[in-house]
Amino acid sequence: MYKKIVFILLFLSFVIDAGAQNTVSSPYSKYGIGDNVGFTNTINASMGGIYNALRRNNFVNHRNPASYTAIDTQSFVFDIGYYSNNIILQSNSAVSKGNTGGISHILFAFPLSKTLKMAGGILPVSVIDFSAAESFPKDSIIGSHKFIYDGEGGINKVMLGIAYQPSFFDKLSVGLNAEYLFGNYYRSSTLTFPDSANMLSSRVEYNYSISAINFNFGLQYQQNLNNGDAIVIGANYVLPSHLPTQNQYRHYTFTYNAAVETVKDSVKYENTEGSIELPQSFGVGLSYERKNKFLIGLDFGYTQWSEFALQGIRYPEILKDNYTFNAGAEYKPDIYGNYLEKIAYRFGVNYQTGMLSLYNTDISQLGVSLGFGLPIKKQGTQVNIYLEYGKQGTKENNLIREDYFRVGVSFSAKDRWFFKRKYQ
């Protein structure tokens, strides 16, 4: 048993870089800590992103750690997923397309005792990936010039969680995740003079290295009904985070000729320490389930992005509090029927008011999702497929509308590890 757990932990350590691949590419990742990776895993995402009141014994619902108590006392659960994001960016004057993808999550869970369960894994938190340019016509002082803004990086997390379901009140479950956040944030501003060979171009670069611990608390209450149905109420709370950063600042001049840059002089170079302040967030949810037949759920979430600060600076004119609304359902026609009847059919919708307000315009987001849980021979093991179409932003006020189509695939396996064999 323990050899298997050690193997999983070693496997996770080798795939950290792969798990941290960019999964979103959006011009709005310029703000805050980047474009928030809003999915949880393939199963949650296919049901509109609901998670607060979702309890299952065959996948890891890491957004609410209280859900880990649903894991069987003799089972080890492993879940790995990959997804691709296809985007179309539209402004009033141009259209561009892109595609990115990567490992969306690697998660596992197992029992410590009948009332105590543990989970862990690695997954991305946010992605920074933007490039923008602003050109100015020739004038009598400095001639034509161009500003270029670039950024890349993101934050990932390795988490370890524990959940407790007291035997004297087994309707209630409480959980806690300890999350190690790490990553890099690079951004630069470049000034060039395309029509003047005598003018020196200049660039300012910022590189932040991030490393910190954060905590996520969860609670779930399950009321079983006389007919075997169940109602679950769930909630979670993520503490505000102080992320210490190691900062590198560099300002230098260069010449640009035939696509080749030649550095001329370093104006300033320094290493400093700073911080990023991440806001608190909380969510509540409600679900109703008829075992082995259907489930419906609703979620509401709030994140206080108005309290975000980068190197001690807040951005109240740009960042605002974000409210999320999620609804989803799952239907299984007949778990004892033919193969098509055993498939879990999932669908959902999600809406965010958005954390950004640019030119007095809120950058909201709306998405609809569809998914399938394809059982394989081993009980509790599935291949899950997830599709989502959505849009973010608008073309009004010279902004950008982003249409996205996401496809996700995950493999969730439940294996019996924790039992004694009567015969060897």
Cite the ranges covered by each PLM segment:
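N-terminal secretory signal peptides that target proteins for export/translocation
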Residues: 1-2
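Subset of outer-membrane beta-barrel
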Residues: 21-424
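Sec-dependent N-terminal signal peptides
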Residues: 5-14
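Sec/Tat signal peptide C-region and signal peptidase I cleavage site
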Residues: 16-20
